């Protein structure tokens, strides 16, 4: 089974406890095929070029053992720096978080801003079905039209993940939509790594023939 984990934090994040190397080596030992590092943009700040180059070094270092991707988790409460679309042009992808929070930037404003990013973009730990109801939108069409993928966050902190595991109606909607779906552990320290949940989510997506980003 092809296994990805595209949401991990390191010491580049204020709440990360491990080095990128430790996260990557744990992924190798856990049988992960693709590991994504996605530290918080508001912690990295002006050191974004340093962060990017560090992850590029890790890509080369571990190239014969695992595929490493350079991502970034971007907070939306409040609206983040307008320079980020240019600053992340070379990144593999970005994850936007907290759009379903009442303090987040306006969703329509977000969609306009998202179009400035040239790298892949996804929604982290977001109940997209609830978000669609909140704005009265066909959220599936919105994500598809704006080339945004969705994340299944296996950290155990978000109920939408557990609902999707057993909700065949929502599974069918996502499958028929063709929207790519990623899997992310949202790891902040290795003691919390949930390998079994990562494998289960990846297996479900493959059984449903739902594409990865």
Task: Indicate where each model-derived feature is located.
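Extended substrate/RNA-proximal surfaces in nucleic-acid metabolism proteins
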Residues: 41-151, 206-211
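Structural motif
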Residues: 2-4, 34, 93, 122
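Charged catalytic cores and adjacent phosphate/nucleic-acid-binding surfaces used
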Residues: 1-6, 10, 20-21, 83-86, ...
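Alpha-helical scaffold segments that flank or form the walls of functional sites
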Residues: 21-38, 56-62
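Generic enzyme active-site microenvironment
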Residues: 5, 37-38, 71, 123-125, ...
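Proline- and acidic/polar-enriched loop/turn elements at helix boundaries
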Residues: 39-40, 73, 155, 186
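Glycine-rich anion/phosphate-binding loops
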Residues: 15-19
């Amino acid at each position: 089974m092809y296994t990805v984990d595209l949401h991990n934090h390191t010491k580049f994040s204020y709440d990360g406890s491990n080095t990128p190397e430790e996260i990557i080596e744990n992924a190798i030992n856990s049988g992960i095929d693709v590991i994504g590092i996605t530290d918080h943009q508001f912690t990295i700040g002006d050191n974004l070029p340093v962060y990017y180059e560090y992850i590029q070094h890790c890509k080369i270092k571990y190239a014969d053992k695992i595929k490493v991707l350079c991502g970034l988790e971007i907070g939306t409460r409040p609206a983040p720096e307008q320079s980020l679309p240019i600053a992340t042009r070379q990144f593999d992808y970005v994850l936007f978080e907290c759009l379903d929070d009442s303090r987040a930037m306006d969703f329509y404003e977000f969609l306009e801003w998202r179009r400035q990013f040239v790298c892949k973009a996804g929604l982290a730990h977001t109940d997209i079905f609830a978000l669609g109801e909140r704005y009265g939108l066909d959220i599936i069409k919105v994500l598809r039209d704006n080339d945004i993928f969705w994340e299944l966050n296996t950290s155990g902190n978000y109920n939408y993940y557990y609902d999707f595991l057993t909700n065949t109606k929502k599974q069918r909607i996502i499958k028929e939509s063709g929207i790519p779906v990623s899997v992310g552990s949202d790891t902040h320290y290795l003691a919390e790594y949930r390998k079994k949940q990562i494998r289960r989510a990846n297996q479900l997506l493959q059984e449903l023939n739902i594409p990865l980003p």
